[in-house]
């Protein structure tokens, strides 16, 4: 990908030496590789249109295939917006641009993680659609679907039946905001495809140029009306004109677009009663001037853009001009109730991008990187729960999402669980006090959206770039089918000595994927032996209907005449039955089977289909496998009686099965055949016949598909065709899953001292869980067995000679197993020979100087005034105070230039209370904090409170100071290796 920077900036950076940034020392905290791949996978579940054959799930299907038909165009494709099914092109185009920005800024990380291909697929899925929406230079279709109609129905995308009108803007009815955002999206797509598919990139550029011109010559949103109340443009269109101009410059190198981008800066919003560019909101679908500002800073190096973006990032991190965005007690930078995590994680992405730019100072880079990690870790679980579906501890299980819920009843309460896991979806997030309810009705905190994940993906890519992680091999969403998709529930309406009347409801509760069926039928089987023995025949039996919701009821039809078995055929062909509401997912029919009048030999007890419904009366019904269901003549539910004739079709007892590759759960799959007079020629996978005796066995009417054969497949959906000598060939669909427990190691962190007097081999115990260790790797390169490490049973020894060759810092070793997620060993490498006790100076102030407060906020600045480095893990700082009412207490590090995750806080109750002190807070540092170099300073901003938020009285505390900026305080004590080096103890 091409990146453009001004010549002046490059020269300046070369002169100042700012190209080198210190590596980040914090611990990884979470598996960013897994989080990244899942966040990208989410977009596959949002796809509209004809889905590709290589899709990685079994619960999404084709949908929205008539989009655009009302205007004579093909407007299929794109993404559904959130938990609904409208295609709003403003947030969609924004989201695609953000994904392209991630590809632009974190290309190496995405390639290394194996996720670039999936990300490019997501980008192109939208850019292809946006091109369709632009049929001529000054016409753009900006929305498909009516938000009000769409929101009035709750069901899966595959079966929606409402009108889906297409809405456009043109010269007479313009929409500069959405058109310019589409231009940005296509220009950004051109940037990432420039070297991969130049022809496609050229197509994107052509459309982007035309769209930009269209937006620029109209400069109006008067025609952008259909999204009103859903995605209004509050910030206007000038921010989009700058944003799109920047991306067109990056795509083309044409400075005309860069000049245009800068020209529109004067029209960006400002803070009230000032001329300062707005900095207190966040980059989002509505306001993209923050991203434009950041890119302009990187491209031009101009101070106006640097100051503006730093003002914004400061406001979100350490505060600007005495103000900071609200922080929840557990550390989320919280802007707004609707999608709070969307704003925090997107700002985290911007912070990471800017921090990694050479024009950002070391001090600012440390602040912004620390902020970014804190916010991403919050989303992944640092508050005690994950906010990403399918990831981490206690993730959301009930997101506000129609297709993932997969209701058949047009109801958020049916079923009372989600049938599908919406892997990777970032939910809206908590309230300003960390409160959150995982409830399907909670669309404020628990809905998901394409724009929620957009900045999140980029931020995760930057986390993976810095801290690594282990993507799950062959991640997929092939789920086990957990309920019957088609079935009949039946009962007895009435019965007499010569008749029975059946009430039957044919159900479609399909979900893997949901689908509209208009060729469903079922059969009710009867035994006419008693009638025939009385001298009658099947032709003497009459079939009538009482209530009928669209079926053609015929019969009796012969099934096995030798055994007097016949059936009533109830055929709903032409009637749509689909999981879309009470009247849609089930159709009722009431039919009567009657022998001649005045006869009394009718016997229900010997009828095949009567088995489960005997005694089921008074309008009640039960599900029964003895009333089999067919889709276009193919058995999809139930069991047929033996000896069938008619169409001479064979059947199998199950048509769906699940095979688990987990060695502890692998089982053969047994299928019972109803041959119906046919013979089994063989079983086919595609056009290839399985090998009898090797892949499967046959014993009588039972076929056993062997686990050795099934285990040869990767996780996927496999269809096995039972090839019979006559009739239709039934298909067994096997969902191949893998719940194998990944291997683990003990420990996952270790220390190594390069000092020869202290160095030791690092020993690791393997917990294979049935997996096999293939290699130990560092940065993708395998260590040499026997030279770098050894294996003895389940113990791996990393040789000290290998570790002694590694630099001081953090080394990450990946244990590469044949299955599951690979565990990682992090080794903190130090060299005690380099460490001598240094001279340290501490300055502090209180972030809160109120007499009474529920939160004490000591801020420290440590400076090494000596000539040798100080290992920070040897340093302890004590702040003395009175607790004023014994309670549990909580500690937070709001920010530190060495990373808040590298700061520890311990509350110590003093054995002998002193005046002004019965407790102290001891602040320490982890190994990841590294060293404090001579003449270097670091900052630590702490905060602590009682668990019940009752007040402290600060004025009588030993260490309390009224300083509001850094100054001396000899009542703060500092220790190095347990030795007091600064301050006076009480």
Curated annotation (Swiss-Prot):
It catalyses: Endohydrolysis of (1->4)-beta-D-glucosidic linkages in cellulose, lichenin and cereal beta-D-glucans. It holds the Pfam family Glyco_hydro_9. Residues 1-25 form the signal peptide. Domain B' repeats lie at residues 744-831. The active site is at 84 (nucleophile), 400, 438, 447. One of its GO terms (biological process) is cellulose catabolic process. GO terms for molecular function: cellulase activity; cellulose binding. Its EC number is 3.2.1.4. InterPro entries: 6-hairpin_glycosidase_sf, 6hp_glycosidase-like_sf, Carbo-bd_X2, CBM2/CBM3_carb-bd_dom_sf, CBM3, CBM3_sf, Glyco_hydro_9, Glyco_hydro_9_Asp/Glu_AS. Gene3D superfamilies: 1.50.10.10, Endoglucanase-like, Immunoglobulins. Keywords: Carbohydrate metabolism, Cellulose degradation, Glycosidase, Hydrolase, Polysaccharide degradation, Repeat, Signal. Domain B repeats lie at residues 651-738. Belongs to the glycosyl hydrolase 9 (cellulase E) family. This is Endoglucanase Z. It comes from Thermoclostridium stercorarium. The lineage of its organism: Bacteria, Bacillati, Bacillota, Clostridia, Eubacteriales.
